[in-house]
Amino acid sequence: MTLYKIGEIVYKNNNNIILESKGEGNLVTICDNSRYSKGEKLKLYLYEVKNDYIQQTYGFKTFKERLLFTDLISIDKIGPKTAMLILDQNWELVANLIAEGDWKEISKINYISDKSAKLICVELKDKWAKIIQNKEVKKFDDITNIKELKQTLNKLGFKASDIDYAVNNISSTKELDLMVEESINLITTQMHANNQTT
């Protein structure tokens, strides 16, 4: 089983990318696709679904995102496509909703019934509360701000890799306008530093 591959995205079309790694082109289905850009070099965690009806490889930015995917597809009536739709909402947001047992918010996701949302929380709440217990469970508003920040920076024309850098290094998640301002400063500082080393 291949856990991850390191390569470059040479093609992107919505939620499908081709990851070139060691001279091979790998067709991979992703979620939350604004995080990815053509030409980006990255480590992509993989999960392959192979049976009589389908052979498809799914890709994830982090191991925890992949772990959440495998946990979701272990739930009755949740297949890979539905799990990817759930993760499309931002996997960290979903993980925190599960840890908080907020099935009502999860049920607002397309194709997720109240019954499925409740089952997800019952089956996975304790596990994901433990996984993220080293951090304080983020409030819903904070997660929403991060999502809005990503959308704003994307509209401003920043690349997915720059947006991820800003989100991972930002110091506050309270006020969106301050987050945007700090993110732009972080990205421009990083770009300037990269230019000096090249």
From Swiss-Prot:
Q: Which GO terms describe its biological process?
A: DNA recombination; DNA repair
Pfam families, per database record: HHH_5
Region entry Domain III, spans: 144-198
Region Domain I, as annotated, extends over 1-61
Keyword DNA damage annotated: yes
Keyword Cell inner membrane among UniProt keywords: no
Instruction: Enumerate the subcellular locations listed in this protein's record, separating them with semicolons.
Output: Cytoplasm
Per its UniProt record, what InterPro entries does this chain match? Answer: RuvA, RuvA_2-like
Name the domain of life: Bacteria
Supply the alphabetized keyword list. Answer: Cytoplasm, DNA damage, DNA recombination, DNA repair, DNA-binding
Instruction: Give the Gene3D superfamilies listed for this entry.
Output: 5' to 3' exonuclease, C-terminal subdomain
Instruction: Map out region (Domain II) in residue numbers.
Output: 62-139
Chain intervals for the UniProt region annotation (Flexible linker): 140-144
Q: Which GO terms describe its cellular component?
A: cytoplasm; Holliday junction resolvase complex
GO MF, one term, reads: four-way junction DNA binding
Q: What is known of its domains?
A: Has three domains with a flexible linker between the domains II and III and assumes an 'L' shape. Domain III is highly mobile and contacts RuvB.
Q: Which family does it belong to?
A: Belongs to the RuvA family.
Record function comment: The RuvA-RuvB-RuvC complex processes Holliday junction (HJ) DNA during genetic recombination and DNA repair, while the RuvA-RuvB complex plays an important role in the rescue of blocked DNA replication forks via replication fork reversal (RFR). RuvA specifically binds to HJ cruciform DNA, conferring on it an open structure. The RuvB hexamer acts as an ATP-dependent pump, pulling dsDNA into and through the RuvAB complex. HJ branch migration allows RuvC to scan DNA until it finds its consensus sequence, where it cleaves and resolves the cruciform DNA.
Complex and partners: Homotetramer. Forms an RuvA(8)-RuvB(12)-Holliday junction (HJ) complex. HJ DNA is sandwiched between 2 RuvA tetramers; dsDNA enters through RuvA and exits via RuvB. An RuvB hexamer assembles on each DNA strand where it exits the tetramer. Each RuvB hexamer is contacted by two RuvA subunits (via domain III) on 2 adjacent RuvB subunits; this complex drives branch migration. In the full resolvosome a probable DNA-RuvA(4)-RuvB(12)-RuvC(2) complex forms which resolves the HJ.
The record's listing under NCBIfam families reads:
ruvA
Which protein is depicted? Answer: Holliday junction branch migration complex subunit RuvA
Q: Which organism is it from?
A: Mycoplasmopsis synoviae (strain 53)
